Amino acid sequence: MKRTISALFAFASLAILTACNPAEDHTLLVNMFIGTGGHGHTHPGAMVPHGMIQPGPDTRIHDWDACSGYYYEDDSINGFAHTRLSGTGCADFGDFLVMPTTGKQCVDYVGEKEKNQHNAFASAFTHENELATPGYYGVKLERYNIFAEITATCRAAIHRWTFPQSEDAGMILDLDYCIQDQTTYEMEVKVSGDTIRAYHRDNWWQYDHRLYFEGITSKPIQSYEIVRDTVLIGEDKTKVQPRCKLLVHFGPTNEAEEIFFKASISGVDAEGAHKNLMAEMPAWDFDGTQEKAHEIWKETLSKIDICAAEGDLNDLDSLQKSQATIFYTGLYHANLSPNVFQDVDGRYLGMDLKAHEGKTDDPYYTIFSLWDTHRALHPLMSIIDPAQNEAYIRSLIQKGEDGGLVPKWDCGSNYTGCMIGYHYASLLADMYTKGYRNYDVDLAYKHAVRSGEYDTLGITPACPSWLYPYIMPKARYYRQTQGYVPADLENESVAKALELCYNDWCVAQIAADRGDTLKANQFMNWSKLYTNYFDPSVGFMRGKLADGSWRTPFSPAHSNHRQDDYCEGNAYQWSWFVPHDVEGLIALYGGKEAFVQKLDGLFSASSKLEGEVVSADISGLIGQYAHGNEPSHHIIHFYNAVDMPWRTQELVDSVLNTLYFNAPDGLSGNEDCGQMSAWYILNSMGFYQPCPGRPVYSIGRPLFPRVIIHQPNGKDFTIIAKNNSRKAKYVRNMTLNGKALDKPYLTHEQLMAGGELVLEMSETK
């Protein structure tokens, strides 16, 4: 019996919607499109947790909202690339885009390429004919009347294309396609039977991005040609010039005929891509691969259960069910990155851009957005999967060994120099102080110290010297030699200095525990230098010039994106970045009363921003508190430090209910590799860690009647919110295992010991 394309889509939809009970299978609560609109920059592609390959739909090439390759408002698909980032504010990847076709294959751009979001072979699509669940993506390509589906393992993808009756079915492999039009300067392709091997090398955010590709078709290739723009350049070329595409022809197809295309990648060499494909996708088993991906996600999302007061998740009210969808979608996003970047044989491309032998049972990772993720993602993982954090630390240590310096933000084994601080120290200090040390502690500590002290020697020659001021900013030099970072000598001086202070404090915690008194004192003294940027006459942290005077003019609401004294923010947001010394910050303001008055002013100030080039990252505003970007994420919990927990509770409630939605534009800013989601997960459970490196959680306002955290040590920790409702946002009483808590804090040790945290909620503070 032949099935039409429409029937296939209906069948796939029914299978997904009726798969299981959401209380038993949390993948059914994942909305893959949350964050694909607005400026969330997520994507609905098919991945397994931390997958090295990220196959999915690509709908645009240019601009900020092309960062993941997909944007919900678009109505055309360029094809399906095999790599992408999730939620970032910088764009890269989009490697080896494929598109199944029928009829004549068009390859030229219409109009100017640099202004066109779509290629000549793009197909219209509708969201009504689009499906996505963890590990699966499917869509009807209107132009070709093809139902295209994708699923994946860690290193390999398999496409299933259901064709209509056609006289000329085929596919296009765009060897040059990449997000934001990187400059491709090396390219190879070779077809042998039904196997396609390709390679390209380009630069954009990554200064030297190299990737190998192997794909195999299930239907014999009848013919193929290679074109550059619209010019045929032959069949038997191996090395080709940029802007080349491979046009493959399968010949006729019957109605609902399925053609499969399986593919893999490697950062090392062609043999690596081949081994990855043979090891992880030996057969043409799309359904089996999808089921395995589903089971992996089902297990990953089962680490936390949300329940009604009486009953399970199915007994929640409609609002709470929608919030549960945001929660589990967030948990999904939190497990996408960092990504494995190592072949099945253990080899990986190091930060020196050389091949290294690694351990097959200890994957090497890339995509460390540490400026974002040190705040909530890694603290979350320390609770539900600390072994994953330890694996991250081992990879970061190896990056330091191979490249000479632990990166702030690495992408495909390239130093990007992106963002500020050295937040490897935060991740390390947090895990170290929580007792997790399954890594070489001596090496880990060595690289934390190395990251904090200004030194450009020993950095791999593979990293171009023009990147040195970004991966090893002079801010560290000025801090060491002058005690502050002059605003007229270093861009983003205040933000860089404040983050250095926090990172220095993190190193000091480890040094002190190890008995390294010299380094402990050195880094602790540096951690207190934040006081040099506080101007009591205005009550804000502000830029100080080399001659010791304050930079003028000054307005706390002013922003000049990445070209002022702050980083993606202004003085309103950055003046609170002293998470490691709240008591010291309170003293700067003149005591608790003045501190509270200033803190209240942050949330009551006008949200109007000043400047001609205001940072688009300043979003999700409550007053001048900007939840859409990371520097603000800890501030709400400062109220607990001044004995005003009710204020923390009502502000957490406000953010959870007004800045997160079950919709494509449901995030107030970039998702940032899981950070925005991790903030929601922790706070909706009822607590947050405002200072990673200090293993203490600040209690806020839980959203759900009952949450059970299934910890890897086998002990469950349950948070019960009695009398919980939309209006009952204040915590009247708190008990831990039956004993009253007199302060709104919980230690990591208490949490990991298991038990019950009972919060009695009230409508009045």
Which residues does each predicted region cover?
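Bacterial N-terminal signal peptides that target proteins for export
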Residues: 1-9
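C-terminal motif of bacterial Sec signal peptides marking the signal peptidase cleavage site
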Residues: 18-19
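Accessory carbohydrate-recognition regions in carbohydrate-active enzymes
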Residues: 22-378, 382-426, 432-498, 506-517, ...
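ATP-dependent phospho-/nucleotidyl transfer catalytic cores
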Residues: 503
